[in-house]
A protein has these predicted regions:
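Short, acidic/polar
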Residues: 73-83, 137-149, 196-203
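Divalent metal-coordination and catalytic microenvironments
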Residues: 6, 21, 26, 48, ...
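Histidine-rich, glycine-flanked metal-binding segment
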Residues: 1-2, 7-54
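Active-site core of metal-dependent hydrolases
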Residues: 158-281
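Metal-associated gating/positioning segment near the N- to mid-region
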Residues: 46-112
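Mid-domain alpha/beta scaffold segments of enzyme catalytic cores
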Residues: 91-145
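C-terminal cap of metal-dependent C-N hydrolases
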Residues: 6, 329-383
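His/Asp/Glu-enriched, well-ordered alpha-helical/loop segment
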Residues: 256-339
Length: 407
């Protein structure tokens, strides 16, 4: 397949120009200014569209199907495939829904059955995000978490701590200990902000370079002084290597934090959704909606794409993802920038007006088309030869019958 005439944005390879992208055997075969159409079995005209690596959503909750009510290792999570491909996402990272005890069930129930690539931060709590148990420090076992992470090193990208309400640093310290043992980063949702454990100490003292603070524009984060200036300690934390992730979610993104911070140069290292049942139909909506917010807050498109592809891939130490290098898995998003009058809502119900909005035209996962909004990879019905339909004795109810007949 040849994606021809699109504007390629690939941060790893420093491409921001019109290029053709050739896909063969599930891999990127070539990226070049003009690849002859005669070489391709199928040519897809993507002129006027943006061709990017498949998006990497570094914070989602997809441990669905367990039946646990009110839990992110259960009913609060969503199955990934219904939310990813339609927005150009080919990789999601579950942010600690499962813990070191129930990760094998998550792998069997969701990861191994999904067409989306699913990676995971492993919760320091053995039962994962299962409600009250997240406060049980006896469940926070660094050694068990590290052992599980090393056992599934190809899937588990880091350790997660979240929702802890106690005054002690126990959750953070044990997560960091597990991360050190397994040589992987830690992602922190700081839970209830307590004066006994100041946020400044989290990002200046407790987290290591390469560790991730998510929900960076949460209202509780001490971000602005009385005159609206970004507090200097945040820039200091970034200089020492702490990563700041969006993690929009259903209650963790405030324009009154994000807009002033963006204007003063404190934007996100990575853009992510915190997808779950409480965010999917609210202000967050989906990955492209979150990316569009940053586009309308003044972040250039190539930077928006970078922070949704190559940057998160590096943060989780999966540098085979988030790029269109020759030989890489052919995970590709083809995006359109719609021009018009749009509104974007934060988690407190406040609106930002904007003039540009991202929409996904096409998603390719491992070389296979998995989303095609307007049928740009298809032939017009009246130009096809005879094909089977309902009522034909050979029709089996799927397109597979026609494909087999043609072969």
């Amino acid at each position: 397949m040849l994606l021809k005439g699109g504007h390629v944005i690939d941060g790893k390879n420093h491409i921001n120009a019109v290029r053709d992208v050739a896909v063969a055997d599930g891999r990127i075969a070539a990226v070049s200014p003009d690849i002859p159409a005669a070489k391709a079995a199928k040519v897809v005209d993507v002129s006027g569209l943006y061709v990017t690596p498949g998006l990497v959503d570094m914070h989602a909750h997809v441990y669905a199907g367990t039946g646990q009510r009110g839990a992110y290792c259960g009913d609060n999570s969503v199955y990934p495939d219904g939310f990813t491909f339609r927005t150009g996402v080919t990789t999601v990272v579950d942010a600690g829904s499962s813990g070191w005890r129930n990760f094998p069930d998550f792998k069997d129930r969701v990861i191994d059955r999904s067409h989306t690539r699913v990676l995971a931060f492993l919760n320091i709590v053995g039962a994962g995000m299962a409600g009250k148990v997240e406060q049980d420090v006896e469940q926070m076992d660094p050694k068990a978490a590290a052992e599980q992470a090393m056992r599934y090193r190809d899937i588990i990208v880091g350790i997660k701590t979240a929702h802890y309400a106690g005054p002690e640093w126990t959750a953070v310290e044990r997560a960091v200990e597990a991360g050190t043992l397994a040589n992987i980063p830690v992602m922190v949702d700081f839970g209830t902000f307590r004066p006994e454990r100041p946020f400044q100490d989290l990002v200046l003292k407790k987290l290591r370079p390469g560790d991730i603070y998510t929900h960076m524009y949460l209202s509780w984060v001490p971000m602005l002084d009385d005159s609206g200036r970004v507090l200097p300690y945040l820039f200091e934390a970034r200089r020492r290597g702490v990563i700041f992730d969006v993690g929009h979610g259903g209650g963790s993104f405030l324009f009154r934090q994000a807009v002033p911070a963006m204007r003063q140069g404190f934007g996100p290292d990575s853009i992510s959704t915190d997808l779950h049942i409480g965010s999917m139909n609210a202000g967050m909506k989906d990955m492209l909606n979150v990316m569009s917010k940053f586009l309308n807050m003044g972040m250039p498109l190539d930077e928006v794409i970078l922070r949704s592809t190559w940057t998160p891939a590096r943060e989780i130490k999966h540098e085979e993802l988030g790029n269109l290098s020759v030989g890489a898995a052919a995970d590709v998003a083809v995006l359109r920038v719609e021009e018009g009058h749009f509104g974007f809502v934060d988690t407190y119900g406040a609106r930002l007006r904007g003039t540009r909005k991202l929409e996904c035209e096409l998603t390719v996962r491992n070389g296979r088309v998995v989303w095609d909004l307007n049928g740009i990879t298809r032939e017009d019905w009246d130009k096809l030869g005879k094909y089977l339909a309902q009522g034909d004795g050979k029709w089996d109810g799927t397109l597979g019958a026609e494909i087999r007949r043609r072969k």
